[in-house]
């Protein structure tokens, strides 16, 4: 369950930012993750709740947004979402119909999008 280590990192960043800005109360944090990260949102929520209990961050709301997998065909430069995300190594481009290399444009990210503080 790598969500626990991700939450530990998130909380460290949040506390550092709050300290730098003289803020005491976190109301909400929004994180974004890509489809390829294998993050389980419920596990992320659970770890966030457990790790914030009894701290100044307790009661803060964690919002989670999934970023879809988007690929760019190296032949025609078309941007597309594969139908079967389990077989991304053997994909035919829906535009040029060639089975060629592609670049992952989105789907691997994990970041804090914003914090709401008091």
Swiss-Prot record:
One Pfam family this sequence matches:
HypA
Q: Which GO terms describe its molecular function?
A: nickel cation binding; zinc ion binding
A GO term (biological process) for this protein?
A: protein maturation
Q: Which residues bind Zn(2+)?
A: 73, 76, 93, 96
Q: Does the keyword Metal-binding apply?
A: yes
The residues that hold Ni(2+) are 2
Which keywords, in A-to-Z order, does the entry hold? Answer: Metal-binding, Nickel, Zinc
Q: Does the keyword Transferase apply?
A: no
HAMAP family in UniProt: HypA_HybF
What's this protein's family per the entry? Belongs to the HypA/HybF family.
In terms of NCBIfam families, this protein maps to: hypA (TIGR00100)
Protein purpose: Involved in the maturation of [NiFe] hydrogenases. Required for nickel insertion into the metal center of the hydrogenase.
Q: What is the recorded name of this protein? A: Hydrogenase maturation factor HypA
Native species of this protein? Answer: Lawsonia intracellularis (strain PHE/MN1-00)
């Amino acid at each position: 369950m790598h969500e626990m280590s991700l939450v530990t990192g998130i909380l460290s960043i949040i506390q550092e930012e709050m300290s730098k800005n003289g803020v005491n109360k976190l109301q909400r944090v929004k994180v974004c993750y890509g489809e390829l990260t294998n993050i389980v949102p419920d596990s992320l929520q659970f770890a966030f709740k457990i790790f914030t209990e009894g701290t100044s961050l307790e009661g803060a709301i964690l919002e989670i947004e999934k970023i879809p997998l988007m690929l760019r065909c190296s032949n025609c430069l078309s941007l597309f979402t594969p139908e079967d995300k389990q077989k991304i190594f053997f994909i035919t481009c829906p535009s040029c119909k060639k089975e060629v290399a592609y670049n992952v444009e989105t789907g691997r990210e994990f970041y804090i999008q914003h914090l709401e503080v008091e």
